[in-house]
Amino acid sequence: MELSVKPGRAQKIHIYIDGEYKMTVDSNFWYSEKWHNFNSIDEEELAELERSVNS
């Protein structure tokens, strides 16, 4: 699945999977995690990302 991001307001990052909005995180979280280096993501990695965001 394609992972893409778009900048939001107030240091927010909007995360999209295959062009569909999935979630919003702040830029501190995004750039402190490994995900900002990814262009694609599988189901297991997506579940890991969602767990990280919700913890």
Where does each model-flagged region fall?
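An alpha-helical, amphipathic repeat domain used for nucleic-acid recognition
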Residues: 1-55
